């Protein structure tokens, strides 16, 4: 079915230019590349752009460690990044750097427009200063204990444990991440972006469908906490763009980083005069702009970025799509275990098409983490791509070449073809909505049908019978046409395989050509298109990824849950005694509208009923909970939430998601009993 042409600009988050690409990064670029390739396959004008994020103190310090100028280091890293992406068949239309003239001009332009419109404030602040290095400490170069949840070893801008944002001066027991020294306070003048002025606009935008439900719900929490003015200044020494009219003051990297999307597109427009920058970025633009990002940078892309664009007279993105993290074999990527795998190490051992397919098979439109289980990876690739897909052609193509002059027959019974073509709109919708896993399941279900057809018809038996030659010709031609349709459906995911299949069919695979009559079409001799995953190659990749641990007397690293969630700092008995734990019976449980993770619980604690909102929806349905006994914190200060008042906390174990288990006391415990 023909569709009207859309004008689309799509981006992936900019990789930081201080190190190599790894398989965690690759999830996002594969996800975006599939979506971009799908749009182009449908005939839309789609531009996929990206750049290296090349500014900030980490760049400056890494270059110093290497004995290089920052400009030299980021140029080298940029070259390495582009080679890794190219070898993974990531088809950027332009790849640039935030350390570019286009980006400097745009960053200054946006800042000056924000200042002229009254959205830039200036004030003197006290900032942490490293007395040993004689430098102000940016937020990521201060570590300490989170002021909100008290988790140790957190950065100075946000907490990885609870997601809270704060200023470096709010950290408990801060230390310089550069020297380890205890920082001192020193006054300096900084410029702030007036984010609270955009609260109404942001609330409207975040509920316009621009964000996934999980993201929109998270933003509601931030709105409840109140938006704060955003410090966009860093003091010299700093590698970045100097702020206009402010010598010695530089733009914070997160101001010019998202502007890098615009800078890269401006660079593309300068190379291709037929493209108009304003057509995509002007306030009244009718083109579409989409950002694919990781869930760790939602705050910047869903609050600061649209507000900056709005305040400086540019358009906002249509949508910001977030994805989760990559784990390997069910655990956080580990250098010691060899599961922190660099893109180049993977490429040294395995076909990039394997990973593209595996990620696609597990991706959805949600922000769930994705586990790269290496045994499942090998099994799924071998089963789906080799055993089902390519095998369909390898079992039938030779008969066409040897017995029928390499030409396909006119298919008399089009029942199977019609059934395959009937799935195109469903598969298209799955691609459009980023439900790649559903698309892969649909396509592989069709592959099963096609293979069943070939197995039942057994053309290898038919060709031995003189009176069955035409039937054999029909069967093999039908199978190859189904193979052509399947690979066309998979073309956004498997571009290299699609090229091989195009050479085999001697024609370009197009979405509009799915229903093409292939009668009389001549094919080329079949060549092997994909090899099985040999697990010893997977093991070799893991071995090459391991970093040798120094032979020291350090204690053995914790195993199990302690490996990723270490025991917190020691407290004394008096601290623990302040916590009043009580047995509670869940008398009622229900869903909370517009809350992705919460259930509303009514808890009987022996003569008193408490209402508690618990983040356990991913693990329990309300009907599973009613009547159960559990343990609650009874003297926790009530917290007013958008959905109502939460009067305590239930206790659960586990890392989160579906892996959560509420605590259940033994039989005999009664509501209201104290837990000691």
UniProtKB/Swiss-Prot annotation:
Coiled coil: none
PROSITE patterns xref list: AA_TRNA_LIGASE_I, TRBD
InterPro entries, alphabetized: aa-tRNA-synth_I_CS, Anticodon_Met, Met-tRNA-synth_bsu_C, Met-tRNA_ligase_1, Met-tRNA_synth, Methionyl/Leucyl_tRNA_Synth, MetRS_core, MetRS_Zn
GO molecular-function term, one example from the UniProt record: methionine-tRNA ligase activity
Motif ('KMSKS' region): 332-336
Record's subcellular location: Cytoplasm
Binding site for ATP: 335
GO biological process: methionyl-tRNA aminoacylation
Superkingdom field: Bacteria
GO cellular component, one term: cytosol
Cofactor note: Binds 1 zinc ion per subunit.
Ligand binding (Zn(2+)): 146, 149, 159, 162
Reactions the enzyme catalyzes: tRNA(Met) + L-methionine + ATP = L-methionyl-tRNA(Met) + AMP + diphosphate
Motif extent ('HIGH' region): 15-25
Gene3D superfamilies named among the record's database cross-references: HUPs (3.40.50.620), Isoleucyl-tRNA Synthetase, Domain 1 (1.10.730.10), Methionyl-tRNA synthetase, Zn-domain (2.20.28.20), Nucleic acid-binding proteins (2.40.50.140)
Key words, A-Z: Aminoacyl-tRNA synthetase, ATP-binding, Cytoplasm, Ligase, Metal-binding, Nucleotide-binding, Protein biosynthesis, RNA-binding, tRNA-binding, Zinc
EC number from the UniProt entry: 6.1.1.10
Cofactor entry: Zn(2+)
Pfam families assigned to the protein according to its UniProt record, in alphabetical order: Anticodon_3, tRNA-synt_1g, tRNA_bind
Domain tRNA-binding: residue ranges: 575-676
Functional note: Is required not only for elongation of protein synthesis but also for the initiation of all mRNA translation through initiator tRNA(fMet) aminoacylation.
Quaternary structure (record): Homodimer.
Family to which this protein belongs: Belongs to the class-I aminoacyl-tRNA synthetase family. MetG type 1 subfamily.
HAMAP family: Met_tRNA_synth_type1
Name this polypeptide is given: Methionine--tRNA ligase
Organism per entry: Shewanella sp. (strain MR-4)
